[in-house]
Amino acid sequence: MTNGTVVRSMVLPDGYIIALDDGMISWRPSSGRRTNYRLQYPAAVLLGMMGPTGYCESVVIGDTRGNVIRLSLPRLELLDACETSGSVIRSICRVSNSSDRLLVGDDSGHVWLIGRDVPNNFLLLFKHDECITSIRTQDNEITIQSGWSKYHYDWEGVMKSNFDRNELFHQKQIERTNRRAKLLERKGSNSALVAMLDLPMIS
């Protein structure tokens, strides 16, 4: 029995998985007994891995210390574990439905490739300049989300395009500041004109 706080959860057709702030991972089936597995550090992200049967057969967990752990479902047996840079794992995606390779993005902007057929089981592909909040791959491109901003990289780490929302927000702020300055200037001019009209006439 654990009294930890739920920090992550994932709903599946046959039950749901919760991750607690004390590192506990719990599989809670719709019927049957619960299964628990305790990690050394709390989970930061969960990813369900569908197998050839069409069902979710394992769960990948990225924790707050840069570890990526894969557990079987429903028994929560340890299948793989990999330690990256020590930064919080923020996002994980599967390279393809037919591959067990994973793309992993962390709090420091590192992009990792993880898999049993990867040298040393993990490889640093490149480093993004900001915290990675979302990562996915499609059409030989890696798409990274950092907050509101989106970036497209090739697999060599060369940026192909980007849409930086921060620049847009900054531009909007400048436009608002300029509009406000013009309004204040206009108001000041009108006030001076009104003051002149209020002066007594000298004959």
Where in this protein do the model-derived segments appear?
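Short loop/turn segments that connect beta-strands within beta-propeller blades
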Residues: 29-32, 73-76, 116-119, 156
